[in-house]
Each structure stands twice: as C-alpha cells, then as structure tokens.
Regions:
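Acidic/polar loop-and-plug regions of large Gram-negative outer-membrane beta-barrel proteins
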Residues: 232-236, 246-255, 259-287
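N-terminal short leaders/motifs
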Residues: 80-81, 141-142, 202-208, 268-270, ...
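Outer-membrane beta-barrel translocator/receptor signature
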Residues: 146, 157-160, 171-248, 254-260
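Acidic, small-polar-rich N-terminal luminal/periplasmic segments of exported/outer-membrane proteins
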Residues: 3, 39-193
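Short, flexible loop/turn elements at secondary-structure junctions
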Residues: 18, 22-24, 129, 203, ...
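Short, structurally constrained coil/turn elements
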Residues: 25, 38, 105, 219-221, ...
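Short secondary-structure transition/capping segments
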Residues: 123-127, 238-239, 275-276
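Cleavable N-terminal targeting peptides that direct proteins into the secretory/outer-membrane pathway or into
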Residues: 1-38
Length: 287
C-alpha cells in the first residue's frame, strides 16, 4: 500500500508535463502559421518569336522563312517543295571558302565533282548537274549567266543565306535542271549599327581578311547602307598553283514608307587562279 501511495504523484506529474508540452507546441504552430507571409502570384508570359525575313538574317541556324519556293516571303513548312537553307550563322561556324563547301552537308547535293578547286561552284543535285547549259545558280532569284567553265562565282562571305530547292522548278524559273537549283541571297543593309572585321590564317598558306559594316544614314531609318569586302590568298592543292580572290559588295536601301523599299546590290569579285584542269609536270633525270 505504501508503494501505491508514493507512485501516484509521479503519474500525475507526467500527465501535467504532457498537457503543458502539448499546449506549448500548439501555441508555437499557431504562431508560425500566423506570421507566415502570403505567397506572391507570378505570371509567366512567353516572349514572341523573333521576326524573320526570307531576304534577311535568320534568328537561328535553322531558317524558318524562304522565298526560293514561291518567290515570296513564305514559311518553309508551307512550301510544297523540298528546301534546305544554309544561313550566314552556319557559314560562320564552318568557315567555307566557297559556296559549294557551305553546301557540303546539304542532303541530295554533291559538291566534290571538280576536285579541290574553289574556282567554280559546280553542284550535282539529285544526280543532275546544276551547271553547264542549264546553269541552275541564282542570286537573289535571278539567274547567274555562265556556261560550263565560264560561270559567275559568289563568295560565301557576301551571302546572308544559300538555299537549295530540290526537284523540277521550270514553272517558277524557266529552263532548268530537273534536279533542282541553288539560290543565293545577298547581305542587305540593316537599320541597326553593325561592324565586323576578321583575320584568318590556315593551311596551304591561307590568309584572309574581311570586313562587314552596316548602319542607317538617318534617324528614321529611311536610308541605310552596307559595305562588305574580302581579300584571300592561298596555295592550291597542286604545287605551284595559287588562289587569290578579292570581293567587295556595297549595298544601299531606300525605304520611303513601311511597305516599300528599294535595295541596290552591286558586287565585284575579281579572281586569279592557276589552271587546275590540266597541269604538266617536268621530270628531271635521264630517260
């Protein structure tokens, strides 16, 4: 009996301690809930896609607009023909010395039919030659006149994009090869200031320098200009042969209103290159 009398106060003390601890914890939870601030509402708005023109720079390496298939500024996904576009941004990554080098990774296009020479942009599209009498090379939608080894050549540094349209195109472009055509788009003046100077050196004693400047001539952007130039010298694959290319392309744009613009796109590209079609090598020694 004595043990039970002495144990009873201990149980009472434990019960009191549990009740007090529960009350204190409840007060702390209530206090935390009371001081917790309200969550702010965050609204996320997607940025609009950058505007792109079929005759201007692409927002990314993959172009979304083209004028080759319809001769109008049309989304590529809405053009029924098969079109591949190599943009200036992609060319800057690969650093091609010719347009055919820029098209090396384009499906359905063979570029190595004339060896290592960069003098001509000879292409084979879907098994059909794009040079010769058909001359399927175009600049800004206009055919570059030429015949076999008398073809007009454009340096890729002068271009905003190079586009390949595969398949028959005589409905839009007249007489042409059934394999397809190459359409090159020149760099055009911009209303935002742009300045670029490059120096490049490489194998075969390659040395190249170029510049690309563009800006608006007035505050309203009515008149703008662009001046692109290039000078390159390198040894050819054959010993004793040398390639020299100089190019300059001044451009001027007049925008009388928001829906009208006139752009002048002259260019000059003199080139000096050794003959790679036939080379006789003198042999020394007794016969």
């Amino acid at each position: 009996m004595a043990r039970s009398k002495t144990a009873q106060p201990k149980h009472s003390l434990r019960k009191i301690a549990v009740v007090v601890a529960t009350a204190v914890s409840g007060m702390s939870v209530y206090a935390q809930a009371a001081v917790e601030p309200k969550e702010d509402t965050i609204t996320v708005t997607a940025a609009p896609a950058p505007q792109e023109s079929a005759w201007g720079p692409a927002a990314t390496i993959a172009a979304r607009q083209s004028a080759t298939g319809t001769k109008t500024d049309t989304p590529i996904q809405k053009v029924p023909q098969s079109i591949s576009v190599v943009t200036a941004e992609e060319m800057a990554l690969h650093q091609p010395k010719s347009v055919k080098e820029a098209l090396s990774y384009t499906p359905g296009v063979s570029v190595g039919t004339r060896g290592a020479s960069n003098t001509y942009d000879h292409l084979i599209i879907r098994g059909f030659a794009a040079e010769g009498q058909s001359q399927n090379n175009y600049l800004n939608g206009l055919k570059l006149q030429g015949n076999f080894y008398n073809d007009a050549v454009i340096d890729p540094y002068m271009l905003e994009r190079a586009e390949i349209m595969r398949g028959p195109v005589s409905v839009l472009y007249g007489k042409s090869s059934p394999g397809g055509l190459l359409n090159m788009v020149s760099k055009r003046p911009t209303t935002e200031p742009m300045k670029e100077v490059q120096f490049k050196a490489g194998t075969d004693s390659l040395f190249q320098t170029g510049f690309d400047f563009s800006d608006s001539l007035d505050d309203d952007g009515v008149y703008s200009y662009r001046l692109t130039g290039l000078a390159r010298s390198a040894n050819a694959q054959q010993k004793g042969s040398e390639e020299q290319r100089y190019a300059i392309a001044p451009a001027f744009t007049w925008r009388p209103d928001d829906k009208t613009n006139f752009t002048f796109l002259p260019f000059l590209l003199p080139e000096r290159a050794g003959n790679r079609l036939l080379r006789l090598v003198a042999e020394r020694g007794n016969r």
